[in-house]
UniProtKB/Swiss-Prot annotation:
It comes from Homo sapiens. The modification Phosphoserine is found at residue 216. Residues 1-29, 94-255 are annotated as: Disordered. This is Synaptotagmin-like protein 1. Highly expressed in bone marrow and lymphoid tissues. Detected at lower levels in cerebellum, occipital lobe, prostate, stomach, kidney, appendix, lung and trachea. Expressed in cytotoxic T-lymphocytes (CTL).
Length: 562
């Protein structure tokens, strides 16, 4: 067999991972020696073979529908991938495919041990040949289901299609930000599905085979593939390792096909300590140990701890993985460079996970620690792990404070008939203690409407103040044409926005009105002012021609205008 460093046409390393067509049966001398593999490694390889077989099944269904619906031979050749098969056949005349070579090697290994009845190989090979003949272009499917957490900080985006590959199941984008800024990868751990307690305590999780069979897979063109047929079952049973996939271990590819993940009952606790170092402007999270964790696999877990400093969803830190341990001792310090003033309103999220080498990591529990109420002089603390609650920065009641002054100038109050109509003045001074969406600072501006007029003509805004969490705007906006009666029906909406290269994102805002719920006799959702906001607006009405000052929270729960 050629060495890894010297790939050749006949070697495994020269073979594509997803075959397009099938060559002749590998010769016996070209097979691989797999006698050194452990049972767990055999199951892992068998999982890849099963995924490959299911992808072939899906691709055959897609190609057959294309042949029935596309009349143009040239377009059909491109859509079905026949062009690639022809090009490959000219370049590699006798090359075998990796899946065929590994499958044949596993059959030979099994037969050598005497675990299969005579003639089994011939039947399996016939099933493989019957099933795998014909062109099969590369299939592209979603690696993992769309993330249901909202790391929900913006509009939902469809999960982009990525080539199926053995990627790191841990790294994930959690961001659904502004339009056009959605992540281009979906990874397994960050797309953790909503967990439900498993009945039976430490009962071993079982693959959801019914869902895998019933949820017929969706191809790139949006069509559904036909269900499995007996020839596929024969192909999957061509080695004992493939048949062993009925056990509790699922590969990442199978997880993606079924669209569901396994859940374990959350239990146990985590021991940790928090310390802030003013000199280094650094928050230090000392993860000491966990006790009584749930067993994820075969009465064991491979746990590690992951932390986020919410609402920054890019602030992930992780400990090392402790193998086969339900009471792991980590003794690791996770560090965050953050000014002490920014800790107000931040929430530390500590979650415990089982590291799955081939599939989706399994959630074991989490705790959330609001830092504004934390006793920094306390000793290391034990907290019980809780079921998963999707972290959403939008759940924060406020993202900072807005300092402003208001003044109402009635018509003719300045003499000589000036101003000709009532004027409403807004002096936007500054924002304080803003909470960023991600690590780093913000590029912010304030936008103002006086409702019910939400047209672009009514919109005014400040300049953009870049790279600051306490931006100073010092900007005045003036609206005219308002009488005292109009102010009782109006609502001034001031919102703070993060300016992005592709799109802007609202961080929070305030609404100044009497909060009656109606405007000019109509019920409206934007008359939802808080007591603080009502008090400031009432002071404006009672003190014409005088500035009234306010320091208001930038609410994240502003009701939609319509």
């Amino acid at each position: 067999m050629p060495q890894r460093g010297h790939p050749s046409q006949e070697g495994l390393w020269a073979l594509p991972s997803l075959p397009m067509a099938h060559g002749p049966k590998p010769e016996t001398e070209g097979l691989l020696d797999l006698s050194f593999l452990t049972e767990e490694e055999q199951e892992a390889i068998a999982g890849v073979l099963q995924r490959d077989a299911r992808l072939r099944q899906l691709e055959e269904g897609r190609v057959s529908k294309l042949r029935a619906s596309v009349a143009d031979p040239g377009q059909l050749k491109i859509l079905t991938g026949d062009w690639f098969q022809e090009a490959r056949s000219q370049r590699h005349h006798n090359a075998h495919f990796g899946s065929d070579l590994v499958r044949a090697s596993m059959r030979r290994k099994k037969s050598t041990r005497g675990d299969q009845a005579p003639g089994h190989d011939r039947e399996a090979e016939a099933a493989v040949k019957e099933k795998e003949e014909g062109p099969e272009p590369r299939l592209t499917i979603d690696e993992a289901p769309q993330e249901r957490l909202r790391e929900t900080e913006g509009p939902d985006f469809p999960s982009p299609s990525v080539p199926l590959k053995a990627s790191d199941p841990e790294e994930a984008s959690q961001a659904q930000e502004d339009p056009g800024q959605g992540d281009q990868q979906v990874c397994a751990e960050e797309a953790d599905p909503e967990l439900e307690p498993a009945s039976g305590g430490e009962q071993e999780p079982r693959p959801q085979q019914a869902q895998t069979k019933a949820a017929s897979q969706i191809l790139e063109n949006g069509e559904e593939a036909p269900g499995p047929d007996p020839s596929l079952d024969r192909m999957l049973s061509s080695s004992s390792s493939v048949s062993s996939l009925n056990s509790s271990t699922l590969s990442g590819s199978q997880m993606s096909l079924s669209g569901d993940a396994e859940a374990v009952q959350v239990r146990g606790s985590v021991h940790f300590a928090l310390h802030y170092e003013p000199g280094a402007a650094e928050l230090r999270v000392h993860v000491i140990q966990c006790q009584g964790l749930a067993a994820a696999r075969r009465r064991r877990s491979d746990p590690y701890v992951k932390s986020y400093l919410l609402p920054d969803k890019q602030s992930k830190r992780k400990t090392a993985v402790k193998k086969r341990n339900l009471n792991p001792v980590f003794n690791e310090t996770l560090r965050y460079s953050v000014p002490q003033a920014e800790l107000q309103g931040r929430v530390l999220s500590l979650s415990v996970w089982h590291r799955e080498s081939l599939g989706r990591n399994i959630f074991l529990g989490e705790v959330e620690v609001p830092l504004d109420t934390w006793d920094w002089g306390s000793e290391p603390t034990w907290l019980p792990l809780q079921p998963r609650v999707p972290p959403s920065p939008d759940d924060l009641p406020s993202r900072g404070l807005l300092a402003l002054s208001l003044k109402y100038v009635p018509a003719g109050s300045e003499g000589a008939g000036l101003p000709p109509s009532g004027e409403l003045h807004f002096w936007v001074k500054e924002a304080r203690d803003l909470l960023p969406l991600r690590a780093g600072s913000l590029d912010t501006y304030v936008q103002c409407f006086v409702l019910p007029d939400d047209s672009q003509a009514s919109r005014q805004r400040t300049r953009v103040v870049r790279r600051s969490l306490s931006p100073v705007f010092n900007h005045t906006m003036v609206y005219d044409g308002f009488g005292p009666a109009d102010l009782r029906q109006a609502c001034a909406e001031l919102s703070l926005w993060d300016h992005g290269a592709l799109a802007n994102r609202q961080l929070g805002g305030t609404r100044l009105s009497l909060g009656t719920g109606s405007s000019y006799g109509l019920q409206v959702p934007w008359m939802d002012s808080t007591p603080e906001e009502k008090q400031l607006w009432q002071a404006l009405l009672e003190q014409p021609c005088e500035w009234v000052d306010g320091l208001l929270p930038l609410r994240t729960n502003l009701a939609p205008r319509t």
